[in-house]
Amino acid sequence: GKDGNNSLMDVDLSIRSGETIGIIGATGSAKSTLVQLIPRLYDATAGEVLVGGVNVRDYDLKALRNSVAMVLQKNVLFSGTILDNLRWGDANATDEEMIAACKHAQADDFIQSFPDRYDSRIEQGGTNVSGGQKQRLCIARALLKKPKILILDDSTSAVDTKTDAL
């Protein structure tokens, strides 16, 4: 922590491939710190973080981060079209893959309601879409990356109950 104390103590967590888990705790209980240890946004000062049985420090940093997609509460959309924003997940994704990811993230319905659909412009920071729409687009972008590990860090806080079913 900022005061020199450990943010996490006595955490022992094993997640199997294909498993979905939720980590629940009070505000300030280091949930975000825990998930940010996986792609090494922070390094553990004690103990170890293993992915696939290998310490994350032993992975090539770029390879590790390419295998992880994180959708945060405050994600960023860039000025450009919806397609431009989705391509940040996978620059080589086909239109079909992008539409499938948006359907999975429950973004396709609202995209289809826009006059230019997937070619609709997004203002810098996504100021012309709602918070829930922005988060769904960010989830779709993360899904396009086809990550080995997908982390949703409070990323559904602005979406409605339909999206909570994700």
What kind of region is each of these model predictions?
Residues 1-166:
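ABC-type nucleotide-binding domain
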